[in-house]
């Protein structure tokens, strides 16, 4: 079976968008990756060398750190290339490109694809931050939930859409309530940041119906359990070991969304 040229072009454009958007994430990932014990500061304002960081988007590189490492003042010749102060320069664009390409392939030419492509970089950013410091910052989780519902509103008014805004709203409320119940029952096992992220998950998955909500939720817990089990077997984790659950929530959401979009 050959891939139609239109679909191939759509996937290619989506992958390019993902790569470009992902290339802007390393600096934001560094700034938001504040450990829990330092959270009162909100976010990082300096690189590890103590130099101020300008802006939120772009590569995580510092020209002043490069000058210090080279031992050459900036006014003695050509400026040294800016030195990286955080990882992700390759991984984040690549991952975002793959995610966006997969979403385009599954969704096709539908209005909601624009929403998925706009939300995907934020999801990758959240996963990167949670993996680094096991924390999901409020400035990312809550606006993401609001953005999902706001953006899906116009999509529901356009022809050829394959979802429902009402179930997106109800999905956000239902999944948020479910995660809140888990948090109240076991605060040490389910962080409140996961509860806020669940609002976005429910909105995105709910667009394609309750079956997609259940599939994405199940996939998140399955992936998290498999990862935790693998760590336990390897002797790297015990019953009280805390793991970042946000990336598995996002991966489960992606899996459910791909299935929901493809079968819609």
Give the positions of each predicted feature.
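A membrane-topology feature that recognizes alpha-helical transmembrane segments
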Residues: 1-264
